[in-house]
Amino acid sequence: MEYFDIRKMPVNLWRNGAGETREICCFPPATRDFHWRASIASIAGNGEFSLFPGVERVITLLEGGEVMLEGVNAFTHTLKRHQPFTFAGDSVVKATLSEGQMSMDLNIMTRRDRCKAKVRVADRTFTTFGSRGGVVFVISGAWQLGDKLLTADQGACWHDGKHTLRLLKPEGQLLFSEITWLPGYTPDTVQ
């Protein structure tokens, strides 16, 4: 289990200058050839996303104005706060900020032939499945995960194991991304 606070994470600038990324976790760790990866991105200007052949991307707007995504296959989609959207990482996708407002997004990327991600908003206590990886990012409220208290802009990631996230206040929300391995793959077989 790894815990994070985005206010304390290192920032990497994008090559095109239109944003920056804070990597939450990568599996296997410390490799460019990841099976799955989670990050927080800040989009500061209009431009194309980097290509990731063979990768599915799930992007969720956390803060800022809406973002219009346009793909070369004639799809358009407007990112709205806390509503995950999935698209192919090997497609050219351009992001246009509404009214020029910077946005902050949670990004989950999975190698299409190894695993998949499902991202959803949780607003009550829940327990994860034991054989799946996951990432949580607290939007609001106070949450207990093991012996750790998590509040806004904090979270955790894991590669497997059963974990209970307990909401400690009457209201709160977090984003939960569950990573499911495809048949024939497990965290032990892909390292």
UniProtKB/Swiss-Prot annotation:
**Membrane-crossing segments per the record:** none
Q: Which InterPro entries match?
A: RmlC-like_jellyroll, RmlC_Cupin_sf, Uncharacterised_HutD/Ves, Uncharacterised_Ves
List all disulphide bridges recorded for this chain.
none
> Domain of life here?
Bacteria
Signal peptide bounds: none
Q: Which family does it belong to?
A: Belongs to the Ves family.
Write down what this protein is called.
Protein Ves
Give the organism, scientific name: Citrobacter koseri (strain ATCC BAA-895 / CDC 4225-83 / SGSC4696)
Gene name of this polypeptide: ves
